[in-house]
Amino acid sequence: MQTTLLIMAAGIGSRFGGGIKQLEPVDEQGHIIMDYSIHDAIEAGFNKVVFIIRKDIENEFKDVIGNRIEAVCKAHSVTVEYVFQDINDIPGELPEGRTKPWGTGQAVLAAKDVLTTPFVVMIIMEKKDSVRFMIIL
């Protein structure tokens, strides 16, 4: 069965205290939490990884993880795609003064054109001094 791991990585990390939380190392070797999650997903049989990111972090994201993960995925015949969450990409009008992304629902909506198989959503969350992740089935 074809399956997709949809990784929400566009958050602004306002509670995280600066920096891009998705790119923060979690061990001495510089791995980030997505490294482990993606490797596990490949072993579980996922065929596609889709990153939901913001356009303004695209280059840094690809430098830190994207290019490396693309090589790992290619070696296992897993495809990688990127979609961009944009605050203006919503049905209807943007409320005056809105500056933050719309969250989970709008992020998944941003990926609608590349989600052609059953998928699992992975969210990376911060809480005070730690980073956690959650899988939504």
Predicted regions and their residues:
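N-terminal nucleotide-binding beta1-loop-alpha1 segment
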Residues: 1-19
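Conserved N-terminal catalytic core of the sugar/cofactor nucleotidyltransferase
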Residues: 3-4, 31-121
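Short beta-strand/turn micro-motifs composed of small residues
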Residues: 9, 27, 53, 123
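Short, acidic Gly/Pro/Ser/Thr-rich loop/turn segments
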Residues: 13-15, 90, 129
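Short acidic, glycine/proline-rich loop/turn micro-motifs
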Residues: 18-21, 93-95
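Short, glycine-rich nucleotide/cofactor-binding loops
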Residues: 24-31
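The conserved acidic donor/metal-binding loop of glycosyltransferases
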Residues: 125-127
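Conserved donor-nucleotide/metal-binding helix-loop-beta segment in metal-dependent transferases, i.e.
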Residues: 129-137
